[in-house]
Amino acid sequence: MKPFTQHTGLVCPLDRVNVDTDQIIPKQFLKSIKRTGFGPNLFDEWRYLDAGQPGQDNSKRPINSDFVLNLPRYRGASVLLARDNFGCGSSREHAAWALDEYGFRTVIAPSFADIFFNNSFKNGLLPLVLNKVEVDALFAQCQVTEGYTLTVDLAAQQVITPDGTTYAFQIDTFRKHCLLNGLDDIGLTLQYAEAIRAFEATHRIRQPWLFAPLR
């Protein structure tokens, strides 16, 4: 998992409440359990005018020119600004995978659905909570300022605007450690690889019958 320390990126404002996981990545694209291949179909039903299917050439599909991600001013955005209850609906880790693969490093919102919130941390995507007044202020600035960027400093737990305004945010200490060091569940386990090998060697000596071949 790629570490998250400090990130400065173009902001895309998604001004909708209760964005659910089926809207983030529609169900027909969930047949794969690989973590890749979902970015091109992020918000598929909003980005395109036709019904998307796995394996389609998206370059030949009619786009919804009014959807915010398709507006030229937001191309290349890596900070998603959202509204309340982002990521609600069914539990699908694919939603975090799709956002990450598209290029988003963080989603800023007043609140998140619990399962999406947890899945994001496990996949290197920072779900960042600010209060509604702060999010409203960011929406207002983003919508009137083309090329609006934000800096997210995870170590300092601050969001920094282009004019130097800062917004503090809270994050669990353990989750912060994992993001700063790029540690997913596998990475955390591998930190103890030597201790695990030592235990297995000792365990084999102390209880050899557990490792005897079956007859």
Curated annotation (Swiss-Prot):
It catalyses: (2R,3S)-3-isopropylmalate = (2S)-2-isopropylmalate. Keywords: Amino-acid biosynthesis, Branched-chain amino acid biosynthesis, Leucine biosynthesis, Lyase. One of its GO terms (cellular component) is 3-isopropylmalate dehydratase complex. It is an enzyme of class 4 (lyase). The keyword Nucleotide-binding does not apply. GO terms for molecular function: 3-isopropylmalate dehydratase activity. Catalyzes the isomerization between 2-isopropylmalate and 3-isopropylmalate, via the formation of 2-isopropylmaleate. Belongs to the LeuD family. LeuD type 1 subfamily. This is 3-isopropylmalate dehydratase small subunit. It comes from Xylella fastidiosa (strain M12).
